[in-house]
Design a protein with these regions (language model features):
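Short acidic-glycine-tyrosine-enriched beta hairpin
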Residues: 76-91, 201-217
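Glycine- and acidic-residue-biased ligand/ion/polar-headgroup-sensing regions
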Residues: 58-70, 75, 183-196, 200
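A generic "binding-loop/recognition-motif" signal
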Residues: 58, 77, 93-94, 103, ...
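A short, N-terminal "cap"/entry segment at the start of jelly-roll beta-barrel domains
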Residues: 1-38, 116-165, 247-249
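Conserved short histidine dyad/triad with adjacent acidic residue
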Residues: 23-30, 40-57, 152, 167-182
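A short hydrophobic beta-strand segment most commonly corresponding to one strand
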Residues: 88, 102-119, 213, 227-245
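Extended, hydrophobic interaction surfaces within ordered domains
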Residues: 62, 70-126
Length: 249
């Protein structure tokens, strides 16, 4: 992990504390212990089988599938997932992940605010009727321009019932944006491509699997010096628009 001015942090794919329960291995990257205030980011890996069921009593959680396929079970309802699927876990919902494949299932999650009361539950949950809309695929979202040449798509947003967190996918073409800041706390996971984070007079390179934490109000710039597009997964708290950026002198 490299700490930049204003508390911005850039994490390598090897950073984070790993915990394993059953077929679920979780690497917690962004959290209070690593410098964040309220937002978290965890990279989870599920081997074949059914994971333990967990609940966040007080926090919203958003998931994004980066590789593999399986089923997210939420309060007894089943949601088939594949790469590009985003899932909303409401506060108090009991959920677990099923991986019926021989391949590993990879998920990036963000929980806001960090919930110290998160715990494993033993009780099985069953439900009937029409499942609530808690999942969307990025291909089902319209592209939205942010600035002159950058594009994002909402993933988990208010239409899925999420009130505190905004999750999005973003694409950064070659080039360098102006320095700017946001009025929210943000965590980013790099899905594809390589670039540079600039904060004041400091900078740090990143690549696939890296994570970046931006505190509220810190002026920064993400540069793409290469010839291919960077794809990133972002989440921020409180909820809003990824295109809302503010520039000053």
């Amino acid at each position: 992990m490299k700490i930049l001015a204003g508390g911005c942090r850039v994490y390598s794919p090897e950073d984070g504390q790993i915990s394993t329960v059953g077929n679920w291995a979780a690497r917690t990257v962004i959290c209070r212990d690593t410098g964040a205030k309220r937002i978290t980011q965890t990279a989870s890996e599920y081997t074949p089988g059914v994971s333990p069921a967990i609940v966040n009593p007080n926090a919203e959680e958003v998931l994004y599938v980066t590789a593999g396929a399986g089923v997210a079970h939420i309060n007894g309802f089943a949601y088939p997932v594949r790469p590009g699927c985003a899932v909303f876990i409401p506060p108090g919902a009991i959920y677990h992940i099923e991986n019926p494949s021989t391949e590993k299932l990879h998920i990036i999650s963000c929980c806001c605010p960090e919930d110290p009361e998160c715990h494993i539950v033993e009780t099985a949950v069953t439900s009937s009727g029409e499942p609530p809309r808690l999942m969307v695929h990025e291909e089902d979202r319209d592209p939205i321009r942010a600035g002159k040449d950058r594009v994002f798509r909402y993933l988990v947003h208010t239409d899925l019932g999420c009130e505190q967190v905004t999750q999005f996918a973003g694409w950064i073409p070659p080039g360098k944006a102006p320095f700017h800041f946001h009025t929210y706390e943000e965590g980013i996971f790099i899905l594809e491509g390589r670039g540079i984070v600039h904060v004041d007079e400091e900078d740090c390179e990143f690549g696939p699997g890296s994570s970046v934490y931006f505190p509220t109000g810190v002026r920064h710039c993400v540069e793409n010096p290469g010839d291919s597009t960077i794809k990133l997964l972002g989440a921020f708290y409180p909820s809003g628009s990824p295109g809302a950026a503010y520039e000053n002198d």
